[in-house]
Amino acid sequence: GGPGGGYSWLQEHLGSGYLAAWHVPENKDAAVVNSGVSRWHNFYVEGLDWLVKHEKIDGLYIDDVAFDRTTMKRVRKVLDRGNPGAMIDLHSANQYNPRDGFASSANLYLEHFPFLNRLWFGEYFDYDSASDYWLVEVSGIPFGLMGEMLEKGGNPWRGMTMGMTARLPWSGDPAPLWKVWDGFGIQQSRMLGWWSGEAPVTTGDSAILATTWRRPGKAMVSLGSWRDADTKVTLRIDWKALGLDPARTRLRAPAIDQFQVAGSWGPGD
């Protein structure tokens, strides 16, 4: 049961005894909240199977999850069986509020993470929070997932230390940053995050963090500051871990629109 309400069609045809879901009036969305375990999920999974086979869909965008882990496993199997490589993308607004029972989105959906490919967390997330909040509650990295930013465009400098950008075209234009990633060959590199305990580049400042992407003969370093004011740091570089000779290496910052100006330094500058 429930208080009813919601879209006009529901009120006209169902009367009462149901729980209306979040909906978009312009799209005539007569959505209702169902139980987390329901025979409707059989209908949902069979529908996905039909779409994979006949429409060749290559993944799902899920805006919060209304079913259990068992159903998610079935969804994953249907996608993998019909279109290997299909992706599942989970979006969630921050559920840590009185209306949603102060539930961290990462904690709320943790049981689904093994079957997902990426996260988009999301409206109302606080990108001014500490780095450990970013890592655990936003990035997806501890769980083997990638993430993207949304609320007010996120923070591109902090986000890059975790491989995150805003999602085109919702908040800003990350294309200039993507171009630099592609030019470096980020897909062929090994990511050594500031949290890993083996970061070859550090700053000596616990609030200014560095993540390194290492390839044979070159490396890319991202710096993210959690300081409230401009701060100068000197990079501490483990040249042996990078496989680079400091006598033959320069540090270059390419110009990236709305991100940074160009610069060039020698080791020790």
Each PLM stretch: what is its role?
Residues G1-E55:
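Active-site-adjacent "subsite" loops/lids of carbohydrate-active enzymes
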Residues D29-A30, N34, R236-D238, G266:
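Short, solvent-exposed coil/turn linker segments
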Residues G36-M87, A93:
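Active-site and adjacent substrate-binding regions of carbohydrate-active enzymes
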Residues K73-A255:
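Active-site-proximal substrate-binding groove within the catalytic cores of carbohydrate-active enzymes
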Residues A255-A262:
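Catalytic core of carbohydrate-active enzymes
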Residues A262-D269:
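C-terminal beta-strand-rich structural cap/linker in extracellular carbohydrate-active enzymes
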